[in-house]
A protein has these predicted regions:
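Small-residue hotspots
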Residues: 4, 8-9, 54, 61, ...
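Cytosolic, membrane-interface loops and tails of multi-pass inner-membrane proteins
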Residues: 25-42
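Non-cytosolic membrane-interface motifs at loop->transmembrane helix junctions
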Residues: 70-74, 98-108
């Protein structure tokens, strides 16, 4: 089984587990706020992104034979880190505009992710 498929399924598992946080938003929002969650919507955003990115990694792993290693690395980093940076904002929303470190990390991850997707498209179309 291709590594991208395995990593995609693992990310899907994390996304499914994060569904419990979605239940907590509905049934125990105050408890989440006591735990430091300041933006409940970011939990939903993280949950959905984990599910989507996990699905996409799995599909790419099945559909594309021999993804070049450097492209696979950038895809996995983007698929794993991007949702987690959204999760951080649930607790620290001010980081989005007030932290150069956060913005730098986010920009680097999304740039790498974009490069990987364009490179994957070029690779697939050239075969």
């Amino acid at each position: 089984m291709p590594l991208l498929v395995k990593l995609g399924i693992c990310e899907l598992a994390v996304g499914v587990l994060s569904g419990w946080a979605m239940i907590a938003i509905v049934e125990r929002a105050e408890a989440l706020k006591r735990l430091g969650v300041r933006q409940l919507g970011r939990i939903r955003q993280t949950h959905l992104d984990l599910l989507m990115q996990g699905t996409i990694l799995t599909v790419v792993g099945v559909a594309v034979a021999s993804v070049p290693t450097w492209i696979g690395i950038l895809l996995v980093l983007g698929a794993y880190i991007a949702p987690l940076t959204l999760g951080v904002l649930a607790f620290r929303p001010e980081l989005q505009k007030g932290s150069m470190a956060y913005r730098g990390l986010n920009t680097a991850v999304l740039t790498g992710f974009t490069v990987a997707w364009v490179a994957l498209a070029v690779t697939v179309l050239s075969r």
